[in-house]
Amino acid sequence: MTAKRVDMAAPDNLLFLDSDAVNSSPASVPIEQNEPTHVLDNQTDDSLRSMPDPHTNTALESTGLMPVPCQDETLETHSQHNEGENESSLVSTQHMDHTRLTEMTINDEKSNNWDFDISGVKENDNSTNLNPDLIHHAGTDSVMERNLNDKQTDLNHKDETFGSLMSSEVLLLKENRQQEMSQDTNLHQCSSSESTGIEYSQTANDAISDAMNSEQSPDQPFSIASNDTDKTTSECSVQTCWDTVESAATSKTQPELHDDVKDVMCESFTTSQTLNIDYLSTDISVCLADLPETDSLNILTPASTLLGILGKNNNVLKTADVPINDSEMVQSINKDLASPNADISKTVFTQMDQNLLHVTDHNVKVLESNRADTVVDQYVFSENIGQEVSQASSHDEDLNSSVQSHDQQLSTANSEIEETSSEFHTQTCQDIHEGVIIAEEAMNGHNTLPEMHDIADVTTSQTPIMKDPMIDEPSYLPDLHKADTPNVITTASTLSDTLETDDSIFETADVSVSDCELIQTVTLKTVTTYETLLMMHDVGEDLTCCDFTTSAIEEPETSHPLSLDDLHESNTPNIPPHASALLDSLGMNKNFLETADVPVSDCEVIQTVTFETVTTYETFPVMHDIAEDLTCCDFTTSETPKIEEPETSHSLSLDDLNEANTPNILPHASALLESLGMNNNFLEAADMPVSDREIIHPVNKDLDSSSVEICTVVLTQTDPKEVQDSDLDEKETESNRIDDSIDGMIDTKFSLDVSKLQPVCSNDLSGTVIHSESLFSQSIPDTPQIGEKYKNDLLQVISPPTPVTNEDLGNCSEEIDDACLKFTGTERDVEGDSELWLEPSQFLAGEEDEGAIFDKWGRSCSSSPPTTHPDNTKASDYTWRENISIDHNAEDWELTFPPVERWSSSDSWASALSDWFQAVNTYPEDSFKSASTGSKLGMAIQDNILEQRTSSDNANNDEQTCLSLNLMQPDEPGQALERGLVKSDNTNGTVFKQGDKERLASCLDMDKDTTTMESQMSLLETSTPESHKADNNAVMETFNASLTHEFNAKLHGSLDISGKLLSAKREGNVLVEVTGGKVSQLGLVFEEERQSIFTSPSSSAYTRDKNLTGCVSNEERCHSSDVHLCICPSQSDSHVSSKAGHAEGNGSFLHSNIGNCTVKPYVEENIPQFIMPFAPICTGNTFLHRSFLKEDRSQADLDLPDKKIINKINLKSNKKSSSSDDSSEDNFHTCPDQSLSSSSGDSDDPSITDSGRKPAYSDTCDIGKELSKLLLLTGEHFMVSEDKRIAYVTLDLDESQHFGRFSLPNCEKQSKPDNMPHKTSKTSSDGKMRSKHKEKPDDKQQHGIQASKKQDPQPQSQVKNEGAGCEDCPVAVIETIVITEKIIPKTQGKKKKKHVQHGTPKPENDAPTDVRSESRQKNVNGKAENLELKVASNSLNKPVAQPSGKTDITKKDSAQKVMSVRPKVEPSMAKMDPAGVNATQKSSPIKLKADTFNTAKMENKTCTTDSLSTCLPSMLNDDIKRRRIADDLSRAVPIRTRPQLPAIFRQARKDGEDVTRRAYSEVVKQKNSTPKEVVVPRVVSEIQADPVPADPQNISLWCQFSPIPPEATIKWTKEAAVLSEINKVEKEDGRFTLTIIKACSKDLGFYKCSLIVANISVSTSEYHLTSEVLMELVIPSHDQPAEPRVMEGDEENIQCSPLLFKEDFLSDQYFGKNQPASILTEKVHFGEGMHRKAFRTTLTEGNLPRFRPGHPCVLKVHNSISYGTKNNEELVQKNYSLAVEECHVQNTAREYIKAYNSVAKSAESFGDLPEIIPIYLVHRPSNDIPYATLEEELLGDFVKYSVKDGKEINLMRRDSEAGQKCCAFQHWVYTQTEGNLLVTDMQGVGMKLTDVGIATCKKGYKGFRGNCATSFIDQFKALHQCNRYCELLGLVSLQPKPKRTVAPPKPKTQPVPKKKTFGPVLNAKS
């Protein structure tokens, strides 16, 4: 063989080699002559080594070529047979590759799998020095002959494929090229990478070896091709390059190759420069049968690979933390690509010897031309993996024989093609070099691999971003169920279903990227793991992000390989930090989040993608906010923009939902919502940044496409078999599903914790009562069930529902085809839903027969007809919010949670006065935004059956949906009682069409004679005045028309239900009346039970008797001025329908047989919106109906709202009847023995005017004798009975209450003159008798009212305007009836008069005498008086009415100026006497302690401490005793002295309003007195805190009074300590300021400013200066942190680990990644505990989630004491255990308080929420005590709110809001954990808590053990006393209820012996 030296000065520095050099190139180790030249199937290369070989290879020398090392680390291969250097000898220059080369090994003789070790191929950037990676093939004689036939087929196929591309001249060289391909298969470097699955027969290899040996003759010259072949060869080369690309792109088995060849770059050449390749489509579609065997994708970084391409699922390639180049990647991939099923021959492509290609321009051109075809053909074969070689060993002889002639032709190439051929082959060479990588990456391709062409673009920023390929939708959904479709989205890529799509593998550049980018890449790639692949536990093994490494985390290991069956059943992802997920995507749909247009940082992608894409399971719970508190690169998840209304890309029908699960991955609210039969096990994130409505809304939208017109999403936790049937074509199935879904009407905006939802009925139409019972008892696991004792009673009223006929359902669908009732509520519903609800049937043992226990509202404990009588019910009546009235006020529904049964002793009431002022206080400006305008009507529903959902954001609601309910009589078993849940929505709900209203009558037209319908109910339809539409958008629109099956067959008898559905149309925000027959309105009227079985008088607003109240004809109603619903008891066989004001859309409507119902005029009602119960006012309903108190229960009438307060009822009408026109707003009604029907005006008139209507008033006048003993003696607001241990409280809010709005039923109307409001009718049978006692009520109240009427000559319309101005003010009024109707024995009254006369000197100016005289005269006439019905018609902010004509006319001007102490607060119910201290001053609420004392002084009397008994004769009787009146009377401080006194204690005593009853003679003496004008200042501005501009360290507290009388004194106090006192203040503006110098934590507390002048003292409310306010005023005033600490200490490097939680935070806890930081710690600790010391420290470096450099922190070092001979290792372990335990305890308590806060948010007026700060585990490697905890430093007064026994131990903080909320939190946790876990040691600064402890039961709680003794739980249970926050949360008292016996109807009540209920804890307060 000859070789000539080429000219090295050629531009390309290339070598042209003859064909003999193919076998002798240094790039491929020559084959030993004494060994066979064929390769074993199972062994490829065992002797790889880098160049140059240190040993001389004799075989290499035999070839005539010698490798010569050069100084530039290159090798020049010289031919040893050269005659001269300048001749045509061969010199090959190549780069020396020192990297480890590919090692190809065979696993065993029996396997066909090729196994490749990882090796690196160093890529050379020099275009002239391409690295030839040597592969030494050890010849063997084994199994190559087994695929002889396959090889022949492959060769034939190759011939057919590429023969057409060549000219006739080139065809002559075909056999030569084939032979060379066979040689190249064995010789070239990368044969290992492409030889997978290819087997060569020994015969073929022998033939090839012979051919190679024959070509090594040194004397054989090159053959030179003629010029005729130049053009043909060039075209052939181009065409062959195109074939190369095309074959790679159209591979049948590797469809992903089509994108790889687009950007192929080989040195300076890219494929795009040669061909403009578009995305080529694969011509095959993978069948589904291939999927289970081939889907096994494992994407690793920075290079990608597929593991186990054909079912191989246990060979996970672990990623190294070093970037590798493409060659290494290629070889790494190959080792896992061996497959036992790879029986098709994959042509082995090897990197050809570079010497074959590098031919200079001066060499033979024919060689280049023909060699190009060979090379490109080989390239084609390397890329065309799927093609089969058609010709194998049968052509070997022809190949061998034609080699020499072929080489001769190549040596004669013409120079005309030199340039073109040279350039082309350079490019081809480069393509081949890159083609190796492409070919190997092509092996990664799956036939079902999703498109992942550019996932790495976010990490390898230096790599050009490729455009997203267009993705086609799958042909049909069933494919999705069987095909795995993970969809991993990055900022510039999308994965799609791979069925019939052109998928491409992303190209990974070998660019060294940062750790953050690498982490991000891992995150984005690992989520594509397929079902058959093991969990990728080690993807982020050694990554580092933002100074945080993952290497410190131990490598988690999967427990076992999951089979397909396991994945389908368990779907358990293994989520390591920062990389993560096993995505079982079976059944996934292609609805995925696309974040392409969201420019986010890498860390955002890490947190959003990593933690949310793992949720795309078909059965795995939602994990929408796993990364809630993680921070990376100064980015926290909470900073991510909230997505308001995420939308899915398309809507799904219910059929689709059944077959294909649809995960919708949102950035912060992702959910897998398969609504039919899905596994409802959701992960609830405590700090969910968005509301659940944003999660649910997309599903609602998707469900719109369903063929079901009404929402059929069944979210109740029932048997999935009952609801999963999605065959919508079957009518019966659809009907049943509709029944279930509508019965389950559940707010789809609350969190999908379906375990708390309650099913309403069962699909089992043939179910029995037992089935219903089991349904209720088993399907509501989180709701306490009724006691065993009363289950039988409950079963009597439960029966299986009546099925809906197909006709009925069809009618429904036809009529409301566009109506899709979405039951979406508000955020508060979400939060309120998780509250704890206890049923009223729970009672304490031994108290069954002790008599009824009444709640704080003075009612029987059961307000609805219970299955057991309320006398035995020992819990409050607010069970699950079921009995909330139909129009339950939206804003105060939280306040109707189960009141705590707190029957405090006198000691506790003493503490209530002193301790609860701030806690209970509520002002109208703090109250709810909208006023209630509806009447409260009770529902005759079983407490344990009906559950009513209320919406809190009703001011914004404009849709209401109401369920219909049937009520059976309690004693009749088998009657169906359906449970209705009402939801409101302000979004997209639709209502029934107007035309549907006409079907109400037919729908409800039942047999009037049906006797089984004993619990008949009217249908109440409400409307809202136009003046309140803005606040009452949430009016109930209609009851749910779809539940036609609720008309039980038993109920209807033989009636035929027409199936026509009730419908109503909204006009504005008001529900119009329902037309059709007489059934025009919805209403609920029930009759009180006729007889009481137990001893206590029942005041339940629900009927217990099966007889309903009678119907009052419409004509009768139209002639009555009493607008309230009053029923004639004698007409018990008919129905009453009333239209009453409806609060904002809450409650349930009940409809029934109302065929004869009459129309009741609309009644609008303003309900006081807040009441804080302290003690019962009476034993029964607060509305003291006379008939309730009589033994004849048949006369009982119950039509009052179930609100337990006096109701304001506004008549909604402009049309007044004659009686209404004649009536005044002071009409009173006495109640003898007859009911009064009431109606005035036309109910159809939806408008309401203030001046145009005159509401009527009614009141009760008859009090039962036995009940009168429990009423207040006087008008005092709070009295305590020492003997009975009962505190009597009258509630108000210092707000004006137009009492005309209230009416009491069963009263006979008595109209009176306008100016005589106190007169009542003489016709009352009991009124005359009662009036004798009532003539001696609190004279000051009479006086005030009379004077008010006298000085009110304005017309009635004006008076009405005054009252109307207050109707938006929520006021709770209970005192009126209680005060005025108390029976006072004459002797006692005389005694009081005597005390008054003797103890009170006669005043000089007896101003009120004349007024009192009139009051007395009017009382003598025997009129029952209601002194305060017209009281408080004016607001404190408004000028008072004109003074009486008998008062000094000069006082009118001051009347217009004087205002109340608190302008923002409406006046209390009792007005001050205008004849007292200035008759026009109706303002100053006087302090409770001294109100009577000041009242006497205002009447120019003197009342000292010594004469207190004479001033309070009525209070010091043996039965009732005022508490804490004698304290500090000399100061005469008004009510504002107390810290935020509760509303119930702020009822003001009006001027001259005496607390005692005065004798008639005294009144006469005072008649002619003229009042003395006294200027009373008022508080213009309450205390406010402002910074001092001059000195940011100072703050100023200021307030303002007006007017400022002369000789006034200003006194500033802090918690009773006088800070400043200024005498004789003279200021025009009335503003007074207190400056606090250098304000610090010591200045925190309650501040108050008082203005004292003469006998008047006016004070502001106590202002609480908290640490939050202090920090806001002082610290932010500086540019730098206030007083930066100059800390001297040691700086050390630490690693912090946060404690993370999974779904169950009690059992699934783990520490996150270590985050490096540096801290500077003081040397001396500032605090010390049992096992730890606290050091102040400052973070100097590092970004922790809650800290930044410079942030003050506290380092707590747990130093365990060394006992005995413990070694250092044991101490370190103990130190670690203590630190870890504290992290677990406090962070677990933090999770509990998060849940507590979510519940507390739903309680209006709850206020600020407490927080437990997180702590972190700190590792200090350089310290002897290596482990500690780190937490935020709390600045301020550190207070222990409660300790382990649950008591509040800090007396200075006895009324602390934080302290009470902490105790309520302890109570809440105790209840939630059923007494098994208690959070103790509640302490901290303000609302931020730390150092908490947890006590658990002995065995722990759910695997969690606390750090406190179990005895703490028992102590808490015994000592905890509920506060107002416990009540707001509906928590039941832990104390045993006191056994009090309510007096039966006896002449005298026997006092109950004293019993200290709560132990000695309050002894100090007594």
UniProtKB/Swiss-Prot annotation:
One CC-aspect GO term: basolateral plasma membrane
GO molecular function: ATP binding; protein serine kinase activity; protein serine/threonine kinase activity
Expression tissues: Expressed in developing cardiac tissue.
Domain Alpha-type protein kinase: 1702-1934
Keyword Cell membrane: yes
Regions of compositional bias (Polar residues) in chain numbering: 211-227
Signal peptide boundaries: none
Keywords, comma-separated and alphabetical: Cell membrane, Disulfide bond, Immunoglobulin domain, Kinase, Membrane, Serine/threonine-protein kinase, Transferase
Biased composition range(s): Basic and acidic residues: 1325-1342, 1401-1417
Primary location recorded for the protein, binned into one broad class: membrane
EC code: 2.7.11.1
Ranges of Low complexity composition bias in the record: 1211-1221
Any Pfam family: Alpha_kinase
Protein family: Belongs to the protein kinase superfamily. Alpha-type protein kinase family. ALPK subfamily.
Protein name: Alpha-protein kinase 2
Species assigned in the record: Danio rerio
